[in-house]
Amino acid sequence: NTKLYKVMCYSMKNGGKRLRPIIIKEVAKSLSLNKNQFLKSMIAIELVHSYSLIHDDLPCMDDDDYRRGRLSTHKKYDEAQAILAGNSLLTMAFNLLAQDSNPSLVELLSILSGHEGLAGGQSLDVDTIEKKLNFKIIKKIHEQKTARLFEFCLAAPFIISNKSQKEINMSRKYGKIIGTVFQIIDDVHEYENKDNEYINILNVMTKDDEIEKCYRYEIEANSLREKLLPNKKNRMNDILSFIINRK
């Protein structure tokens, strides 16, 4: 029960809505997977998400003192412990996935959380602060920092179910849409609350345009859902509606 473990637990206990593991669960249930088959993927994605939030809040990154109404990990403890806690959560995620003996899951999450995904998006975010913003740059940052992990949430159950590569690719596209919508709505809320960060889509686009885009994405996502999960009862449509309409 080391100090580092306590720091890790502190960040995990401030987990918000747990939306990412919920999505894995809903898709997995629709594919008739049992809990033991997808539980580690649920935990792994939340570990990676928590690691990203710890590092995102650091002074050298977004420099946020609070996360969901509580002190950020580096403010509650210190920067060194926060960095180590984030590193430990990330490695723990891959430890869990490796136990499932499905290398495709490990491969996908490593791609989506590494330089081609989450970490790469954060690098672009930091590098863009001193540069002129445009839609293409912000879209790229949001796709990598946010949408990539949602890709894993949708694709993991299809990988576990040994579905075709075509279906896995479609599920990743579905996840990318959900993640993109999630970030657009986040940006809208930040803009309206005057908690406006530099990397915000509403700094280069209008709110009405982005909300309209979300509804177009919803139609595309529902079309993919019907192809991937035909005649399956699930809450994926409700989840996407919740993301768009959340306050």
Roles of regions detected by a PLM:
Residues 2-226, 232-244:
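Mg2+-dependent prenyl diphosphate-binding active-site environment of isoprenoid biosynthetic enzymes
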